[in-house]
Structures are given as C-alpha cells and as structure tokens.
Amino acid sequence: LMLTVCDEAMVRSVEKACVQEAKECCVHLKIDSGMSRIGARTELEAQQVLQTLQACPHVRLTGAFTHFADADGQTEEFTRQQFERFQQLTAALSSDIVRHVANSASIHRYPEMHLNMVRMGISMYGYPPVASELPLKPCMSWKTEVTYVKKIAAGDTVSYGRTFCAG
C-alpha cells in the first residue's frame, strides 16, 4: 500500500509520524481533477503541497494520481477533461514518479490512459463498472461511514457519474 497526500497538512502529519518512528515514507499525491473529493484541485494547491514535500526530508513523492468521476458514463467528454487536467497539474513533476488515473471503467474503455499503472477497483470485487460490458458477479458488500467533508463551489459535480451538482 502507498500513502496518499492531498494537502500540506497531510504531508506535515506524515513527516511528523516518520520523525517519531525514525522512518522514511513514500507517498502519492492525489489530484482532484473533477471528482470533488480529496486532492489538490488547482495548480497553486499542487505547488503548495510540492513545496511542503520538499521541506519534509522523511517523505518522498513517488507517484501522482486522480480518480475519474464518470469513466463509465454515456459520454467521454468529462473523463477526457479530467485526464487533460491531471496531465497539466502533473506536467512539472519528475518523470520518475508513477502516474495513475485508470479505474475499473477506464481500464476497459480508455487504454490510452493507463499511464504507468492502473487501479483495478470495483471490478476486482465482482462489480462491473458497466454491467453490459463485463460478465462479473459480486463477491462481497461494503459498509462505511463519513470520514471527510470537503467544501466545493456552486456548479462543481461530485462522485461517480457526477451524481450531485452543488447549487
């Protein structure tokens, strides 16, 4: 497993834990390209996280990723916009880091977006991102609770299929 950082506070928390444990840690930077969950959303936010990482000698950036909100949707436009946004926000990063954007739906629909790695998500548990595309059967169920709340602007869309639009 790889730790995710999405803001300066997270980077500092990881650094503090590393110092306390006398360890080093590799992290991946989460970019919010349109899912409206965790992640650096603007170039400024991404730069601030990167500056904080540079000041934290025990934390090393080894990857960057985003998550597609609508890769299983009817149209490709929003997914392609997210991919372009991710490419723009990570263009200045080292070519040595792992870049990954492809979730279950995009693994099958957008092979050109596989980059260095893919993340087999819901399909791994038998839930096809689009039922008609893969003959999978569920193998488990999930129960959870809210752990993170994020403020977003009017007009921003949230989650898979962009199911909610902030008013």
Predicted region positions:
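Short, intrinsically disordered, charge-balanced linker/junction segments flanking boundaries
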Residues: 158-167
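Active-site loop/helix belt of alpha/beta enzymes
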Residues: 9-26, 32-156
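Catalytic beta/alpha-barrel core
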Residues: 1-11
